[in-house]
Swiss-Prot record:
<keyword id="KW-0809">Transit peptide</keyword>
<dbReference type="Pfam" id="PF17863">
    <property type="entry name" value="AAA_lid_2"/>
</dbReference>
<dbReference type="GO" id="GO:0005524">
    <property type="term" value="F:ATP binding"/>
</dbReference>
<keyword id="KW-1015">Disulfide bond</keyword>
<dbReference type="GO" id="GO:0016887">
    <property type="term" value="F:ATP hydrolysis activity"/>
</dbReference>
<dbReference type="InterPro" id="IPR027417">
    <property type="entry name" value="P-loop_NTPase"/>
</dbReference>
<dbReference type="InterPro" id="IPR041628">
    <property type="entry name" value="ChlI/MoxR_AAA_lid"/>
</dbReference>
<keyword id="KW-0602">Photosynthesis</keyword>
<keyword id="KW-0547">Nucleotide-binding</keyword>
<comment type="pathway">
    <text>Porphyrin-containing compound metabolism; chlorophyll biosynthesis.</text>
</comment>
<dbReference type="Pfam" id="PF01078">
    <property type="entry name" value="Mg_chelatase"/>
</dbReference>
<feature type="disulfide bond" description="Inhibitory under oxidizing conditions">
    <location>
        <begin position="345"/>
        <end position="387"/>
    </location>
</feature>
<keyword id="KW-0436">Ligase</keyword>
<keyword id="KW-0067">ATP-binding</keyword>
<dbReference type="InterPro" id="IPR045006">
    <property type="entry name" value="CHLI-like"/>
</dbReference>
<dbReference type="GO" id="GO:0015979">
    <property type="term" value="P:photosynthesis"/>
</dbReference>
<keyword id="KW-0149">Chlorophyll biosynthesis</keyword>
Length: 415
């Protein structure tokens, strides 16, 4: 049976009821895990049994071992994010998604050789640390049952004390040739039938949970895989169904896609699922081009020394992101501004409400990045073209609107 990835069938409610109805007090972690387990979908006719994860790496015994493993994986030097020259629109969209993952990811379209992949991969150094359960392939959060893997949730229900380690948010690359089983994970049908055990080998979606999933040349990816990725990103859950056996696990990640419009566009209904859209152009200023070439030459000669020269700027930016993530919940946006955002969307004939929601979230994230607790008109003006330009109705033969129409409508409504 083919994989079914549908928010209606694969995902539990987005906001868990983690409070006792009788006392209005927070539930214990064990009770919360039980509440989440009760909401995970099960279908009549699907087999039930124990859940095991196979073919995963052995857990690190200590935090030092985990750090050593992470250092080994990152031996290839990464170009510093702070050293990227220009491309401010793309960099801002990436930072806002790191601050608020619920924005829904970003689609980056631009000419070849403009630094799309380099910029996305340079984001790794700025990602904050998170607490994860040692040895868990789903990067389970030990404090939040909503993002726990099934095996960890069972351990919590049994009262086991979970070993925890601090690790960097991961970035997972999805290759163009990946199969659906590699992306979603596979079930060992033979073991399930003979031993009554749901033997599940996690895929890339499991590895990307609580992290970033990057798809280069996403416009060349098979449409059914794009559907799978977007549905999982929207629902936060991945469900694998094979031969009457169903397994669900959390898959909350920031989806970042990039591509060259000359090689083809994504379908409009798929574009709409990306929270933001960034356009990247070739730098035309001769001085900037020379600076980019020189900086790249410095990096190629001595990557370590080049990275150290930007260490202070990188640390400052990382602290700014961490502070913005912490203060995001305190940021407010006036009702009048929310009404005007919706008016812009309505007058541009934007289908659905995703444009309204994403614009509100992106404006709040930008205010938090700037260290403020109130959204201004300037914040909205900065993000609204990236939130709406790819949602406008257009002639199939035209390229994506450059954002000028959005900007014109914005100033018409806000002035």
């Amino acid at each position: 049976m083919a994989s079914a990835f549908s928010p209606a069938t694969a995902a539990p409610a987005a906001s868990p009821a983690l409070f006792s109805a009788s006392t209005s007090r927070p539930l214990s972690l064990t009770a919360a895990a039980a509440a989440v387990s009760a909401r995970i979908p099960s279908r009549r006719g699907f087999r039930r049994g124990r859940f095991t994860v196979c073919n995963v790496a052995a857990p690190s015994a200590t935090q030092q071992e985990a750090k050593a493993a992470g250092a080994k994986e990152s031996q290839r030097p990464v170009y510093p994010f702070a050293a990227i020259v220009g491309q401010d629109e793309m960099k801002l969209c990436l930072l806002l998604n790191v601050i608020d993952p619920k924005i829904g990811g970003v689609m980056i379209m631009g000419d070849r050789g403009t630094g799309k992949s380099t910029t996305v991969r340079s984001l790794v150094d700025l990602l904050p640390d998170i607490r994860v359960v040692v040895g868990d392939p789903f990067n389970s959060d030990p404090d939040d049952p909503e993002v726990m893997g099934p095996e960890v949730r069972e351990r919590v229900l049994e009262g086991e004390k979970l070993p925890v380690v601090t690790a960097k948010i991961t970035m997972v690359d999805l290759p163009l040739g990946a199969t659906e089983d590699r992306v979603c994970g596979t079930i060992d049908i033979e073991k399930a039938l003979t031993d009554g055990v749901k033997a599940f080998e996690p895929g890339l979606l499991a590895k990307a949970n609580r992290g970033i999933l990057y798809v280069d040349e996403v416009n060349l990816l098979d449409d059914h895989l794009v559907d799978v990725l977007l549905d999982s990103a929207a629902s936060g859950w991945n469900t694998v169904e094979r031969e009457g056996i169903s397994i669900s696990h959390p898959a909350r990640f920031i989806l970042i896609g990039s591509g060259n419009p000359e090689e083809g566009e994504l379908r409009p209904q798929l574009l709409d699922r990306f929270g933001m859209h960034a356009q990247v152009g070739t730098v035309r200023d001769a001085e900037l081009r020379v600076k980019i070439v020189e900086e790249r030459a410095r990096f190629d000669r001595d990557p370590k020394a080049f990275r150290e020269s930007y260490l202070e700027e990188q640390d400052k930016l990382q602290q700014q992101i961490s502070s913005a993530r912490s203060n995001l919940g305190a940021v407010q946006i006036d009702h009048d501004l929310r009404v005007k955002i919706s008016k812009v969307c309505a007058e541009l004939n934007v289908d659905g409400l995703r444009g309204d929601i994403v614009t509100n979230r992106a404006a709040k994230a930008l205010a938090a990045l700037k260290g403020r607790d109130t959204v201004t008109v300037e914040d909205i003006a900065t993000v609204i073209p990236n939130c709406l330009r790819h949602r406008l109705r257009k002639d199939p033969l035209e390229s994506i609107d450059s954002g000028l129409l959005v900007v014109e409508k914005f100033y018409e409504v806000f002035t």
